[in-house]
């Protein structure tokens, strides 16, 4: 069994479980946002404005929760960077080589998963924005003809 509380550098003392828990929470919140964005897209395509307004509120709330977790992670990573003698603006990926070898694959995997999910979320947000824009154009065209 791997002891995650071990440290890899004399000046760095923190719980690997805390960082892992924070990353798992962030991953879960991003997953929740992805689900909301899919629902938002369905409401756009099905022309359900009342449902869309409600989902938009949920999306904003979820994005705030994600932002809060991301800020916590950035603070944690800044502290780690300082402890390892690295620049404060180092990314978690840049700090992974400082971690104990036994923990590196686990953290690499979850960081990759989070980054992939963020990319998917950005694509979905862009799709939804374009759909809403196109829906507005079509509505304007219909009203101009009427």
Where would I find each of the regions flagged by the language model?
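C-terminal-biased regions
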Residues: 2-42, 49, 53-146
């Amino acid at each position: 069994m791997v002891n995650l509380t071990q440290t890899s550098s004399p000046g760095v003392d923190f719980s690997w479980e805390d960082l892992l828990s924070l990353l798992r929470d962030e991953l879960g919140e991003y997953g929740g946002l992805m689900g909301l964005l899919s629902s938002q897209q369905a409401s756009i395509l099905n022309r359900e404005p009342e449902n869309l307004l409600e989902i938009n509120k949920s999306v904003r709330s979820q994005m705030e929760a994600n932002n809060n977790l991301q800020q916590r992670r950035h603070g944690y990573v800044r502290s780690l960077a300082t402890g390892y003698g690295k620049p404060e603006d180092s990314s978690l990926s840049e700090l992974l080589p400082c971690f104990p070898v036994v923990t590196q694959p686990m953290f690499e995997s979850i960081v990759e998963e989070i980054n992939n999910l963020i990319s998917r979320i950005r694509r979905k947000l862009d799709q939804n924005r374009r759909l809403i824009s196109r829906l507005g154009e079509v509505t304007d065209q219909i009203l101009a003809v009427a």
